[in-house]
């Protein structure tokens, strides 16, 4: 089993992503962090394969700067954990551009747009 920690603002969104991951790859075991403060602990205790974090342009602790800092903490705790940011490219094109740049700069392992299909989401996570 590959454990994937989900750190999302919206519970409904996190549940949908959880279901999409399991349906498309039964080897995935999603675990939801209830708060960003819980994320590092969950990644460490579960030996997470990946951390998927929602990024928003307007709220802390879900803004890009705080997500990058949290990703750095997770990498320090679990070096092999892949950091993936999930961004709504239609709601905030500027934020999506900043997330793409974070990938180019090597600050994250990958990013996913909120508009992708569940199968594509699972395929991206599978190939990290």
Outline where the language-model segments fall.
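Non-catalytic signal-transmission and effector/linker regions of two-component phosphorelay proteins
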Residues: 1-18, 116-128
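Two-component/phosphorelay signaling modules centered on CheY-like receiver
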Residues: 11-33
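Two-component signal transduction core modules
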Residues: 51, 83, 110-111
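Conserved phosphotransfer microenvironments
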Residues: 51-76, 90, 94-98
């Amino acid at each position: 089993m590959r454990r994937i920690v989900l750190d999302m603002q919206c519970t409904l969104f996190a549940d949908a992503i959880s279901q999409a991951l399991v349906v498309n790859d039964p080897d995935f075991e999603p675990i939801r962090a209830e708060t960003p403060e819980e994320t590092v602990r969950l990644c460490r205790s579960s030996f997470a394969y990946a951390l998927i974090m929602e990024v928003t342009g307007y709220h802390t602790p879900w803004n890009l700067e705080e997500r990058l800092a949290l990703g750095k903490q997770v990498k320090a705790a679990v070096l092999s954990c892949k950091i993936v940011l999930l961004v709504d490219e239609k709601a905030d094109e500027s934020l999506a551009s900043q997330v793409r740049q974070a990938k180019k700069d090597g600050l994250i392992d990958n990013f996913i747009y909120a508009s992708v299909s569940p199968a594509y989401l699972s395929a991206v996570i599978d190939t990290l």
